[in-house]
Amino acid sequence: MKALVLDMYGVIVKQTGDDFVPYVQQTFPDLSVEEIHIPWFKADIGEITSLDVWKTIGFQGDLEKIEEEYLDTIELSEGFIEFIEKVRNKYKLAIISNDSSRWSKYLREKFDLNKYFDVISISGDLKLQKPDERIFLLTIEKLGLNAEDCIYVDDREGNLAVAKKVGMKPILLNSRNISYEGVAVNNFDELVNLVVAHFGIK
């Protein structure tokens, strides 16, 4: 095994992304999930900016401040830093994340993540979104490896299925407490133990 490829939401950070709708509905309780999701998904695929999301939803005033107040509610997953420090000098590391360009940049700078990763594939930058297999294949190509050399960690079964389809070794980080028939862990301590036991990472 030569590389570890990680999802962002629900893996590197605690929040799975499912908190955005209720966060918005605190201010706009009458907005439907669909009305919130439509601009959000457009930003994730790079069709609009993240600031356009807040404006479309109905927020007014200093949109950058409003956005940063939301992003500052997001926290790193427990044990992530310890995990990444253990593997950073032994294996290539990559992120594949469905996110707007601005949100991803803000969070990566906030948590000083860029220094850890050889490849960072963000849907808003690439205009490719999981579960489109092209974002996986592009990441593998940028790593300069074969798919079978890569472990992929995500909290969503659909993304893991695509990773497996292209030849990566999928692992569920079960931050959302879902049922999954494949290889799964509950935290980064378990992930370290699993990759050592099953994939030979030491």
Task: Give the ranges of each region predicted by the language model.
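Active-site neighborhood of HAD-like aspartate-dependent phosphohydrolases
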Residues: 1-38, 56-61, 165-166, 180
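Asp-based, Mg2+/Mn2+-dependent phosphohydrolase catalytic module
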Residues: 2, 100, 108-202
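Short hydrophobic segments within beta-strands
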Residues: 7-8, 96, 153
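Short alpha-helical
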Residues: 19, 75, 102, 157-158
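A metal-dependent, Asp-based hydrolase signature
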Residues: 40-67
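Short, acidic loop-to-helix structural element flanking the phosphoryl-transfer center
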Residues: 51, 65-94, 105, 133
